[in-house]
Amino acid sequence: MKTTILLLVVLTIVQLSKAKDNLQFVFVTAKGQDHQACNYPQGPKITNIEEPDSELTEDGKKEAYEFGQKLSSEYKSRLGVTKWDSAQNYWAIAAIEKRTKKATLITAGVIAKRQSVTSKTWSDEELQKTSFPALNDFFRFINPQHCPKYIKSILSKQNDINTILGKCEAALKTVKEHYPAVNKPQHTWLVYETFKRMKQQKASNLEWLTDDIMKQLQACSAEITWFAATNSDEWRKISGGLLLTDIFTDLDQITQGKPQPYAPGGANNKMSLFTVPQVLVISHLAVITPPGTKIGSKDVTAQNIYPEDGAYVNLELFKGDKEDWKVKIVYVKGKGEPQQTIALPGCPEKCPYNKFKQILQQYAISDDDHKKACGFPA
């Protein structure tokens, strides 16, 4: 009898060891690589270049191409792709021209074109292939004219804001001596990102901008942006809920064996790549990291989640032998940083899709409800 039981246990273990989750689809959300230092919307004037006119630097072009190569190396064989084809098995999209150029360069890296493409002048037709104007709705929440209720709600938390900015008070005092227009809470974050690029690009007259000042600005930037995106469930929903709804729509279709909406490859699509600004990476993270989420083995904090240049979030969708679907969230917070797994509360690293959706559903929102929550003008 004992022998029979032992044999059954061994057979069960063998069967479990044979069970395998097969990667079916990857949803990539990537922050931009290096571009010309510029002034960001809702920010003070620091340079002579506005954000929509800021071009990728040569380093940025190279980094975008290399990121495409990294994606291909990571996923081509795992997804069972023989040859990448934008009409069949991957979809690269962006919201504005600078990012369509980056998406095109990443695409070139994915399909292993020569690196000389980084100096190529792309045609309007080539750039249009990566354009997806509907992405602009995801930016609604940061526009004071389009989402006044959200902005007003944030500004009503003045005590919390003052506490955060008090941690970089000395740095801000020095910054204001050189740029008096830095006088709003969001300016701390926006000037940090501008100064970072100016230092990388060796701009002149920045001797006063010490490493200590940059460290203080970075810490405040991380806290103020994470606070604005996650201070309440409602804020999470407004900042990232539209994107989450879009992701659910795509994953629902894929798990039902149906075509991914709008993807050129339809049901054959294996990877979607969104190239987005930092603010959308933050809002995306806000709706996939509810309280209790772990990044690696640690609790999520403003500092360990803040996306620097080269950051990306991958949602990996797996299918098991029993037609069961699971999602794994992989995050890299910047160039040279290691991959980390984001684990939802009560879930293993590969979270059953139904549970994944159940946990995060509270943050999903329709376009009409988002407009109402924003106070979007009729």
Curated annotation (Swiss-Prot):
Chief location category: secreted
Disulfide bonds: 147-374, 168-220, 347-351
Residues in the signal sequence: 1-19
Entry's Gene Ontology molecular function annotations: phosphatase activity
Keyword Lyase: no
InterPro entries, alphabetized: His_PPase_superfam
Role noted for this protein: Probably modulates blood feeding of fleas on vertebrate species by binding and sequestering different mediators involved in the host response. Binds histamine. Binds leukotriene B4, leukotriene C4, leukotriene D4 and leukotriene E4. Does not bind serotonin, adrenaline, noradrenaline, ADP, and stable analogs of thromboxane A2: U-46619 and cTXA2.
Similarity section: Belongs to the histidine acid phosphatase family.
Domain notes: Lipids and biogenic amines bind independently through different binding pockets.
Descriptive protein name: Acid phosphatase-like protein XcAP-2
UniProt organism field: Xenopsylla cheopis (Oriental rat flea)
